[in-house]
Amino acid sequence: SNETKQSSQQSSEKKETTKTHTFVNKSNSGITSTLIYTVEGDNVIKQSANNIADPEILGATPEDVKSFIEEKYKGYNGLKGVKQTIEIKDGKVVQDLEVDFSVASISELRKALPEEYSGIGNRVSFSNSKKALEKMGFTEKTN
């Protein structure tokens, strides 16, 4: 029937239902964080983070900052659905992180990084995330 055709088309064309929200935090001296949430309804389906740390402002060497970030986020290493790179670029330390919640296990993420993934259940709520981000000093960028 036509109806089943339409619904299977919709699921392959995710662009209609997903929205992207970008949050930026410059309130921590020496660190600029940009988070991009891909959201379907209230469910976060993907989260990307780009953190740029300026060692000069932080009063440390790029190598020290890099190892601090590696240590702090080592819980992400080896988790399925998670891609992370931490590198020194032009004297700054750049962390890129992508979490695909359709693949990642939220209980694993919680175990690895409890302070980053609070709450219960096996989904990430966008409205809860947004509140938490605003408390941390993030502001949503509107296009």
What does each model-identified segment do?
Residues N28-S29, A53-A60, S102-R110:
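Short, cysteine-centered beta-strand-loop-beta hairpins and adjacent loop/turn segments enriched
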Residues S1-T20:
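N-terminal, intrinsically disordered, polar/charged segments of Gram-positive cell-envelope systems
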Residues G75, L79-N143:
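Mature, soluble, non-transmembrane domains
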Residues F23-N28, T85:
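A cross-family detector of function-defining hotspots
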Residues I36-N77:
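Alpha-helical segments in soluble extracytoplasmic regions
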Residues T18-K19, V44, F126:
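Domain-level marker for long, solvent-exposed, non-transmembrane regions
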Residues K14-V24, E70-E71, G81:
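Short, hydrophobic/aromatic-rich segments at coil-to-beta transitions
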